[in-house]
């Protein structure tokens, strides 16, 4: 008798653009969850270079570069509260990537608020792989903008 319950995780981000750092987190998250919903956020506090539809398309295309065979994955956009988005997919886990201590303060506060709003949804932090700790979408955009 198999009583394994499917674990669904949400990996939210702006993904403007998606980077190898993001893909590293996706690949590693697939070792933890059975299904991963990669969710491009429409964030009113950020002014993304790419539209949400472009970001969703880029993520889907980028997933071809990595092994996601360990879990089912789906790519969607969202513009509501993360915990409401997680509930929509019956996700029990929010996956967040951390590059450095500077990321932790913000992520810690967000995880605390999400826990208050949805106590049954856990946040899991994955540290960036050592070779990707300096990768950031902001730097990628800046280099591309200056034809680097």
Regions found by a protein language model. Give the residues of each.
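Nucleotidyltransferase catalytic core that binds NTPs
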Residues: 1-148
């Amino acid at each position: 008798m198999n009583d394994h319950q499917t674990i669904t995780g949400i990996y939210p981000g702006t993904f403007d653009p998606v980077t190898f750092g993001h893909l590293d987190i996706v690949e590693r998250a697939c070792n933890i969850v059975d299904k991963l919903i990669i969710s491009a956020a429409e964030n009113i506090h950020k002014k993304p270079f790419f539209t949400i539809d472009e970001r969703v398309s880029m993520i889907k295309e980028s997933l071809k570069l990595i092994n996601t065979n360990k879990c089912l994955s789906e790519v969607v956009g969202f513009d509501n509260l993360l915990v409401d988005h997680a509930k929509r997919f019956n996700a029990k886990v929010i996956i967040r990537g951390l590059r450095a201590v500077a990321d932790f303060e913000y992520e810690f506060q967000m995880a605390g608020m999400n826990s208050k709003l949805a106590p049954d949804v856990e946040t899991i932090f994955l540290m960036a792989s050592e070779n990707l700790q300096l990768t950031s979408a902001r730097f990628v955009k800046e280099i591309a903008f200056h034809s680097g």
